[in-house]
């Protein structure tokens, strides 16, 4: 009898517990149904925010730091075609050293500074061997006039060193650069590319040459042909450098009024021809020449001085800066 009573009490206890649990569950469900829709929506938003915050924390802790983007590749320069494949030149430098051929570089000891620059630009057949302490030893780009090609060929073992990966840009009038077999300079370049297939040789197109003429007219107000002017290799080199470089450090270029000073020092026109003509004598004779064609060195330097007021151009050996302009110049590099 006692055993039956204990068994009955146990069953009642179990039933009571189950009923209580069911009532609690029913009450919870009922309370959710009775909540206004706004409260239900707020609860869902709180749950989503909590989940998002948790996920964000995990994402920050597990994700790597963002990587730096790779620098932009070399930009394509229009108007400069490969002699062998006729493909356009692709090149870009943040910092450039434009090394002139001036006698002002003698005993300057600027060579180490020049060689530390990302890209070093030289002109024509200006050598480095024997002058490294003053002009440096590296060459990234060499701009060469058609009249200097023969001298380049004679000194090809020194000047056409393909181990440095130097880029060579040749310029000349269309009669010398024509491709129909009658262009003397172009024929020499074709032969050169066959002898040195690894040479990075480029030529300025005829259309680009006309644009260089137009740029000279825009900057000076003078028509090149009417004024019997031959653009110098320095004109081509400075303009190419503006296309190629973000910053240009020019070594050996005097300001345009340098030769007007009667006390100016006498230096050779070329640092590698110490017994050659005086620099200012050469500049003044070409600037004043009227018969025949001449380089207008001083006129070109006035343009370079104006460009330096706006663009990232700096002059060393001698060191000088252009005075502040009286009027604001339009931003943007010279365009063709």
Curated annotation (Swiss-Prot):
It is found in: Golgi apparatus membrane. GO terms for biological process: glycosphingolipid biosynthetic process; oligosaccharide biosynthetic process; protein glycosylation. Keywords: Disulfide bond, Glycoprotein, Glycosyltransferase, Golgi apparatus, Lipid metabolism, Membrane, Sialic acid, Signal-anchor, Transferase, Transmembrane, Transmembrane helix. Predominantly catalyzes the biosynthesis of ganglioside GD1alpha from GM1b in the brain, by transferring the sialyl group (N-acetyl-alpha-neuraminyl or NeuAc) from CMP-NeuAc to the GalNAc residue on the NeuAc-alpha-2,3-Gal-beta-1,3-GalNAc sequence of GM1b. GD1alpha is a critical molecule in the communication and interaction between neuronal cells and their supportive cells, particularly in brain tissues, and functions as an adhesion molecule in the process of metastasis. Glycans are attached at residues 137, 161. Residues 38-49 have a biased composition (Low complexity). The keyword Hydrolase does not apply. The keyword Transmembrane applies. PANTHER family: ALPHA-N-ACETYL-NEURAMINYL-2,3-BETA-GALACTOSYL-1, 3-N-ACETYL-GALACTOSAMINIDE ALPHA-2,6-SIALYLTRANSFERASE-LIKE (PTHR45906), ALPHA-N-ACETYLGALACTOSAMINIDE ALPHA-2,6-SIALYLTRANSFERASE 5 (PTHR45906:SF5). This is Alpha-N-acetylgalactosaminide alpha-2,6-sialyltransferase 5. The chain crosses the membrane at residues 9-29. The lineage of its organism: Eukaryota, Metazoa, Chordata, Craniata, Vertebrata.
């Amino acid at each position: 009898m006692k055993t039956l009573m204990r068994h009955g009490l146990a069953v009642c206890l179990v039933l009571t517990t189950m009923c209580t649990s069911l009532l609690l569950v029913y009450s919870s469900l009922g309370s959710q149904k009775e909540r206004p829709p706004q409260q239900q929506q707020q609860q869902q938003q709180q749950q989503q925010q909590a989940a998002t915050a948790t996920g964000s924390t995990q994402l920050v802790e597990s994700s790597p730091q963002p990587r730096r983007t790779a620098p932009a590749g070399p930009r394509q320069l229009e108007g400069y075609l490969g002699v062998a494949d006729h493909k356009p030149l692709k090149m870009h430098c943040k910092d450039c050293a434009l090394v002139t051929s001036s006698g002002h570089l003698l005993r300057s000891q600027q060579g180490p500074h020049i060689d530390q620059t990302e890209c070093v630009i030289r002109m024509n057949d200006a050598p480095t061997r024997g002058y490294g302490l003053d002009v440096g030893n590296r060459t990234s780009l060499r701009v060469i006039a058609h009249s200097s090609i023969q001298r380049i060929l004679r000194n090809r073992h020194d000047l056409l060193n393909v181990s440095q990966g130097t880029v060579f840009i040749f310029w000349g009038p269309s009669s010398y650069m024509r491709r129909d077999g009658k262009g003397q300079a172009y024929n020499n370049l074709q032969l050169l590319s066959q002898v040195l297939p690894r040479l990075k040789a480029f030529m300025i197109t005829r259309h680009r040459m006309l644009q260089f003429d137009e740029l000279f007219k825009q900057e000076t107000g003078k028509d090149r042909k009417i004024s019997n002017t031959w653009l110098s290799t320095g004109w081509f080199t400075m303009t190419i450098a503006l296309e190629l470089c973000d910053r240009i450090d020019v070594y050996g270029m005097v300001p345009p009024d340098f030769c007007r000073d009667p006390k100016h020092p006498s230096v050779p026109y070329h640092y590698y021809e110490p017994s050659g003509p005086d620099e200012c004598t050469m500049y003044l004779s070409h600037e004043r020449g009227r018969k025949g064609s001449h380089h207008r060195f001083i006129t070109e330097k006035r343009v370079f001085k104006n460009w330096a007021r706006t663009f990232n151009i700096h002059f060393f050996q001698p060191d000088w800066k252009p005075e502040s302009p009286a009027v604001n110049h339009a931003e943007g590099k010279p365009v063709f």
